[in-house]
Amino acid sequence: MAKILGIDLGTTNSCMAVMEGGEAVVIPNAEGARTTPSVVGFSKKGEKLVGQVAKRQAISNPENTVYSIKRHMGDANYTVTLQGTQYKPQEISAMILQKLKTDAEAYLGETIKQAVITVPAYFNDAQRQATKDAGAIAGLDVLRIINEPTSASLAYGLDKGDIEQKILVYDLGGGTFDVSILELGGGVFEVKSTSGDTRLGGDDFDQRIVNYLLAEFRKIEGIDLSKDKAVLQRLTDAAEKAKIELSGVASTNINLPFLTVGADGEPKHLDIDLTRAQFQKMTEDLLEKTLVSMRQALSDAKLTPNDLDKVILVGGATRMPAVVELVENFTGKKPYKNINPDEAVAIGAAIQAGVLGGEVKDVLLLDVTPLTLGIETLGGIATPLIPRNTTIPTKKSQVFSTAADNQPSVEIHVLQGERGVASENKTLGRFTLDGIPPAPRGIPQIEVTFDIDANGILHVGAKDLGTGKEQSISIQKPGGLSDDEIDRMVKDAELHAEEDKKRKEDVETRNNAEALINAAEKTLKEAGDAATEDQKSKVTAAIDDLKKALEGKDSEDIKSKTEALQEAVYPISTAMYQKAQQQAQQAQQAEGEAGSHDAQGPDETVVDADYEVVDDEKRK
């Protein structure tokens, strides 16, 4: 049976896992790492780079490198420009997913066509749809979109059997924050509530350090570096490193030599000490935001901290001591640590993939919609149809009427959010139901139906109960893509994949040619009298031809000249091998003759020595 990949598509890092032998196993990437930086770049030669290689070149090429694209998923107006080409967030995310898919296929030795992808619990409909679109562009059939905290609970609770317990999952990732309350027992994972902030994560903690370093450098040197992209990239990398170090030590030194050049032409260096206390002080308001979400989630679940049985920390940012202390103080419980915060979400996604594929039995996942869904009604009021924290999939209907006499149509304005005024909520889409027969206001019966699938994606319909006429839409805008757009992007992605493959082959062809030139030149030096002058001149000419071919870009010409050089070198290499073989045989014969001479017996001139045995007792 074909494998279904479980993917944690993270803001700063991504991870993938698969079910093997009844267990979820994390798949390392091509570089051997268990997580992959969610970074995409294009080299100055136009080569697409994803993961660690993209992150490594970001300092020298910041304008063609993209970080944290997940924060812009679902934003229809956001694009990034790389090497003069504009890309939507879905396309950048698809490049990351393609990298994971390709590496997984190489590891497993089979083609991957299906996946379960996780998203923050607080992602809205547009963000979820954008994630699904990214999977499609990458060539993946996304079977399910599941919430990250819920996925982590699967990783934690799969082996807990029939033990009933209430758990809080605190998920602070690179760019998003979620907290979910779940009830586990008998193989059922039921989400009771969720809360969070899709614009809060480890990146924000890094940015506070960057702001501090910019301010200190301005104070010391009088230079503002806030507009220098290359410098900002170096500061961001240093900030992330400092944040990680401060999780284990009380103080760290941030040293960046040759950061910039002053007006006098002298290089300027940055050398600043940062203590854990300073870091915690500059980020305490960020932690306070997570506390607000924890209170909200518990309130919605109608629970108190004392009702919790376990607290699970997920996401790399939860390694910060201040986070652990905050959660422990609020809940009164030490966080459960027998789970890798970087890998738990991907493992849970693989388990859900196993459920969908029939490999994992007796597990039922009951998730919720994070935000209230409704429509705009008379006076600009937001009227809810499905309250937040409703278990999904679900379907709700409500009957509305016209606001004016003889109104021929109604516009259905679909909203997501908690505000009472329509304009303060997120618009998911609009559509019109036409053909309503003339009637006084309040008489026509318009039934509006909201249907949320297991992915948390909304479908809306409106029906005139009097005429039976109906209209429906699957919410995709803003931020979603049409089928035509997805098809175009899939083709673009496939084209890029072919281009990348060809570019890689071209590089390998050049590398092989250069290696052969070095080997051939070495062979000429060592050949001596093993080769004729005619043979040597042929090799020299072939080397010159290949060097000339390398000055151009015609790979086929390089391959042809490489083969010609191999043919020219072969006779010399063969002659040298034969000569070395003859010399070795002669040496063995010489050793054999010397050995037989030694075995003839002692020389007659050698005199054997007389000896006498002395009795020690007599000596005494």
UniProtKB/Swiss-Prot annotation:
Gene Ontology MF terms in the entry: ATP binding; ATP-dependent protein folding chaperone; unfolded protein binding
Pfam family, one: HSP70
Keyword set includes Transcription regulation: no
Biased composition regions of type Low complexity, renumbered to the chain: 578-590
InterPro entries: ATPase_NBD, Chaperone_DnaK, Heat_shock_70_CS, HSP70_C_sf, HSP70_peptide-bd_sf, Hsp_70_fam
Composition bias type Acidic residues, residue spans: 605-620
Swiss-Prot/TrEMBL keywords: ATP-binding, Chaperone, Nucleotide-binding
Region (Disordered) residue spans: 577-620
HAMAP family: DnaK
Function field: Acts as a chaperone.
NCBIfam families cross-referenced by the UniProt entry: PRK00290.1, prok_dnaK
Similarity comment: Belongs to the heat shock protein 70 family.
Protein name: Chaperone protein DnaK
Organism (species): Methanosarcina barkeri (strain Fusaro / DSM 804)
Lineage: Archaea, Methanobacteriati, Methanobacteriota, Stenosarchaea group, Methanomicrobia
